[in-house]
C-alpha cells in the first residue's frame, strides 16, 4: 500500500511539475535571436523569435525605387509577413545635419503617403510612411544612417503595424 501511495505521489508531482518544465522549455525555445547581416558586413539586425530568409536573389521581390546594385540585404519572414532591406546609397556628399534636413523635406513633399519623421541624432534618423494601395495599407519603418556611406534600413508590410516594424529594427548595429 505504501508503494502504491508513493508511486501515486510521484505521478502527482510529475504531473504537477511537467507543465512548468514544459513552459520553461517553450519560453527558452521561443526566445531565439536571429541576426541578419548585410553583404558588406556593416549592418547587423538582431530580431527575436523570427523566421527571416534571404530573398535577395528574387528580383521580383526587390523594393521599388531601390536599385538592385544598392541592395545589400533583403530578408522576408513569411510568418510575420515582414520584409527587411538594407541599401548602401553610396558615399555621403554632405554632413549629417544637412542630409537629414534634405531627406525630411523630400519625405514630407511626397503627398501620396503619410509620413512621420523622428528626431535626427548624430548619424541616424528614423521615419515611418504608410499609404493605401490595392492590397490595403502599406506600412514602412526606416532608419537612415549617415556614415562614410549613406544607408537606408527599412522594414515593411501590408500586415504588420508601425510598432511591430519598429520593433524588428530595434536592435540594429553598425560596424565601423
Model-derived regions: residue spans:
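Detector for intrinsically disordered, low-structure N-terminal pre-sequences
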Residues: 3-6, 32, 46, 114-116
Amino acid at each position: 500500500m505504501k508503494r502504491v501511495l508513493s508511486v501515486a505521489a510521484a505521478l502527482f508531482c510529475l504531473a504537477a511539475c511537467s507543465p512548468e518544465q514544459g513552459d520553461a522549455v517553450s519560453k527558452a525555445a521561443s526566445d531565439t535571436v536571429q541576426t541578419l547581416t548585410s553583404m558588406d558586413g556593416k549592418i547587423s539586425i538582431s530580431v527575436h523569435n523570427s523566421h527571416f530568409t534571404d530573398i535577395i536573389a528574387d528580383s521580383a521581390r526587390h523594393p521599388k525605387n531601390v536599385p538592385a546594385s544598392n541592395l545589400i540585404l533583403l530578408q522576408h519572414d513569411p510568418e510575420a509577413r515582414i520584409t527587411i532591406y538594407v541599401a548602401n546609397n553610396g558615399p555621403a556628399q554632405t554632413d549629417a545635419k544637412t542630409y537629414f534636413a534634405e531627406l525630411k523635406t523630400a519625405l514630407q513633399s511626397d503627398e501620396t503617403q503619410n509620413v512621420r519623421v523622428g528626431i535626427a541624432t548624430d548619424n541616424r534618423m528614423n521615419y515611418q510612411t504608410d499609404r493605401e494601395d490595392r492590397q490595403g495599407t502599406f506600412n514602412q519603418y526606416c532608419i537612415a544612417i549617415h556614415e562614410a556611406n549613406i544607408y537606408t534600413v527599412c522594414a515593411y508590410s501590408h500586415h504588420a503595424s508601425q510598432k511591430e516594424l519598429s520593433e524588428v529594427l530595434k536592435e540594429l548595429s553598425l560596424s565601423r
